[in-house]
Amino acid sequence: MKIEDLDKKYCVGLGEILFDVLPTGSQLGGAPANFAYHAGQHGLHSVAVSAVGSDLLGDEALRLLDEKHLKYVMPRVDFPTGTVQVELDAEGVPTYDIKEGVAWDNIPFTDDIKEVAANAGAVCWGSLAQRNEVSRKSIYQFLDHTPNDCLKVFDINLRQNFYTKEVICESLKRCNVLKINDEELITIGRLFGYPGLDIENKCWLILGKYNLDMLVLTCGVNGSYVFAPGFKSFQETPKVEVADTVGAGDSFTGTFCASILKGKSIAEAHKLAVEVSAYVCTQHGAMPVLPEKYTK
């Protein structure tokens, strides 16, 4: 597929596309597609980059993306379209059983994908899509072809055992923004040899060590932080009636990046991201339509 109307404000979600099989039914998801969808709701050109199978689920994935008016570059490959069994606990918090050997493990770096990279204003990727070497190499090639001023967001998204210290290190070197949650921060602290530091000191350490422009830390009901050199923003988490939390973090990241690209301050972008994420928690599935008050 040829991508039209690319400009320097293009927001790219790069990595897995899959069906979350929830107790209430199947929902199209995958953090990168969720990110692109939510960035797009804030008026930015956005595109999801992944791969789907030459199967009925692949057809359905592309149909649903079309239905949601989300542009995509997704080669059809000889692997099944990705699925995840999602179980929700009493608070609506998900656990995942992620099927292996699927299409998004085998994303090729095509000319169309290269063209998207060259025109990216922001790109968001995670650790999960790097579990297989084929997609990992394509992600690195994509990042290598982005403009110098591209917002490169590593939304770490640790899932099950699908990550290594080496993969995390490589992405930390390639990003200029890290998005992480409090549980992942504990894992990273243990992995990288500074488990004793408190939350804020861990964040300042990572920010400086990898020369990041920003570090976004979400702590569930305990609020969220954005750290930048010489600057810290904290926002409390609004109390809402939770339907499920699937995709809430991606809506946060998509909203935050879109706001930064539109010229909002870090504090303004952070505040809106918190409000949108809280709203998404009140809805079923990862890609609800946002009310106009959040997107105008």
Please state what every model-predicted region is.
Residues 45, 151, 177, 213-214:
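Proline-centered loop/turn at the N-terminus of a beta-strand
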Residues 10-12, 121-122, 151, 214:
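Structural motif
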Residues 1-70, 84, 242-243:
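Glycine-rich phosphate/adenosyl-contacting loop at the front of the ribokinase-like
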Residues 1-10, 192, 196-296:
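Conserved phosphate-binding/catalytic region of the ribokinase-like
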Residues 45-127, 145-148, 296:
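Conserved N-terminal subdomain of the carbohydrate kinase-like
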Residues 122, 126-201, 223:
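Conserved beta-alpha-beta core of the PfkB/ribokinase-like small-molecule kinase fold
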Residues 115-116, 170-171, 208:
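Structural alpha-helical scaffold elements that stabilize or flank donor/cofactor-binding regions
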Residues 16-17, 128, 156, 251:
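Active-site metal-binding loops of divalent metal-dependent hydrolases
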